[in-house]
């Protein structure tokens, strides 16, 4: 439950957290009671945990050619945006999806329209946050140029970006070395704007640079390495950005000490 998630974050010594508020593998969504959401906010505040982020379900795909599933994805993001507002969360992080060999111009326009629709119906106090992709085939938003295009075309200051370090590395952006991270983050700023970076998924990579596969590893046990994460954390772009772990865990049960 939600309250147990806060307890778990506190036990780990976390200062920020990310959670689902429904099964990430299904469309079903049950709205939480006002009492439950109020208790969540109070407990998170008492433990001084924040900012808090929700992660959208994995079925959301704004690039799909299946219009019924596109509609379900838009509705799911709407549910999560309202829940985030009621829970005191900063926003909803989600994967934009992929397309099936469709013209990117068509997919781009569909994705922008979907983003605009979600934001038009959403509370004004929460962000809709696109997570960068790992560069897998036909994935939307694996390059800074694509992400920047979506942000600019949507034209809403509530649309933000979460940078997943493993996805970034897998897509060919070398953030693990001082000689290259400056160039990478300069490109991010030029294409997207550093003001639109609001969260980092801090994950090491099971596969090497530009592998174009989504494979997370514990920090220091992958190709980015501990020195790589020290490089990332020292860079000015990340000084005030919350870091969220999505790693297997040393015991295989998710983030741990």
Can you say where each PLM-predicted feature lies in the sequence?
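Histidine-acidic metal/acid-base catalytic patches
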Residues: 144, 148-257
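Alpha-helix-loop-beta-strand connector modules within alpha/beta enzyme cores
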Residues: 34-54, 111-125, 148-155, 223-235
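Active-site beta-loop-alpha junctions enriched in small/polar residues
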Residues: 1, 22-24, 56-59, 97-99, ...
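Conserved, mostly hydrophobic/aromatic
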Residues: 9, 55, 73, 84, ...
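N-terminal pre-domain/capping segments
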Residues: 1-56, 60-82
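Active-site acidic/histidine proton-transfer and metal-coordination neighborhood
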Residues: 62-160
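Residue-level preference for long, well-ordered alpha-helices that form the structural scaffold
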Residues: 29, 33-36, 66-69, 73, ...
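Short, well-ordered coil/turn segments that N-cap beta-strands
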Residues: 13-15, 46-52, 86-90, 123-127, ...
């Amino acid at each position: 439950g939600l309250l147990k998630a806060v307890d778990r974050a506190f036990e780990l010594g976390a200062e920020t957290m990310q959670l689902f508020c429904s099964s990430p593998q299904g469309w079903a969504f049950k709205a939480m009671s006002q009492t439950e959401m109020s208790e969540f906010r109070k407990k998170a505040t008492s433990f001084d945990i924040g900012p808090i982020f929700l992660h959208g379900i994995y079925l959301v795909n704004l690039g799909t050619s299946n219009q019924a599933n596109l509609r379900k994805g838009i509705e799911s993001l709407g549910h999560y945006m309202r829940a985030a507002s009621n829970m005191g969360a900063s926003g909803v992080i989600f994967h934009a999806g992929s397309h099936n060999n469709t013209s990117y111009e068509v997919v781009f326009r569909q994705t922008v329209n979907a983003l605009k629709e979600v934001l038009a119906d959403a509370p004004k106090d929460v962000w809709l946050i696109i997570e960068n992709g790992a560069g897998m085939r036909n994935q939307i938003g694996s390059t800074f140029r694509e992400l920047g295009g979506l942000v600019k075309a949507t034209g809403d200051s509530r649309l933000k970006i979460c940078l997943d370090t493993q996805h970034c590395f897998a897509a060919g952006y070398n953030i693990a070395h001082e000689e290259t991270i400056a160039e990478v983050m300069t490109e991010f700023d030029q294409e997207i704007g550093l003001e639109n970076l609001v969260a980092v998924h801090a994950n090491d990579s099971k596969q090497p640079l530009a592998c174009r596969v989504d494979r997370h590893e514990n920090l220091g046990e992958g190709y980015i390495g501990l020195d790589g994460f020290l490089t990332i954390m020292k860079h000015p772009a990340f000084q005030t950005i919350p870091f969220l772990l999505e790693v297997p865990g040393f015991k295989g049960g998710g983030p741990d000490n």
